[in-house]
Amino acid sequence: MVNSYSTSLKGTLSRWMSYSELGVFCDTVNQKIPCKIVLINSKTNFLANPKSALNTLNLNLNSGDDIEIVLIASSEYELDNCVKSIKDILKGYTTLC
């Protein structure tokens, strides 16, 4: 069995964003750090994998929407780097904790 490490980041969006835009940000992180990323809109309980075909749908996140980003990595080091990168990339949209 392979060990995996996971964490969840939660925040409220300060401005409008599409799921595909959020997916691009997450994909940017994933190119540098191998991790699995799942996006959750807490208001609608909508789950999205940034690499799925769901991003072709015109789904949007609005200012004030609560989001959760679940990160899964194979090491604690990779997970820590992924958390830092996601927070850095999304700092203009939300404060994740």
What is the meaning of each model-derived region?
Residues 1-5, 96-97:
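Short, Lys/Arg-enriched, disordered terminal segments
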Residues 3-13:
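Short glycine-/aliphatic-rich beta-strand segments at the starts of folded cytosolic domains
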Residues 5, 40-42, 64-65:
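Short glycine-enriched loop/turn motifs at secondary-structure junctions
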Residues 12-14, 41-43:
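Short, glycine/charged-rich beta-strand-loop motifs at protein surfaces that mediate ligand recognition
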Residues 16-36, 46-65, 79-87:
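Amphipathic alpha-helical interaction surfaces in cytosolic regulatory modules
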Residues 36-39, 92-97:
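Conserved short beta-strand edge segments in small beta-sheet-based binding/regulatory domains
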Residues 43, 67-85, 97:
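Amphipathic, charged alpha-helical scaffolds that flank and support histidine-based chemistry
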